[in-house]
UniProtKB/Swiss-Prot annotation:
The gene is rpl29. GO terms for cellular component: cytosolic large ribosomal subunit. NCBIfam families: L29 (TIGR00012). One of its GO terms (molecular function) is structural constituent of ribosome. This is Large ribosomal subunit protein uL29. Keywords: Ribonucleoprotein, Ribosomal protein. It comes from Saccharolobus solfataricus (strain ATCC 35092 / DSM 1617 / JCM 11322 / P2). It comes from the Archaea. GO terms for biological process: translation.
Amino acid sequence: MTVDPEELRKMETGDLLKKLDELKLELIKLRVQSRMGTLKNTASIRNTRKDIARILTVLSEKKKVKREKVENK
């Protein structure tokens, strides 16, 4: 379930934050499954971490653009 960065850039900040919360919960569940030995696809932990990083990157890009707009006024 890899998230496309271009798709993320089109999303609103509130939607990105909701998606971030969902992915963090999913990561917690995956880590629990990993510890219990019931996780079948171990790459899903890595993929979820990368998705979280993508969302955080897009959020910081949006903050930077907003900050530049305020400074230029």
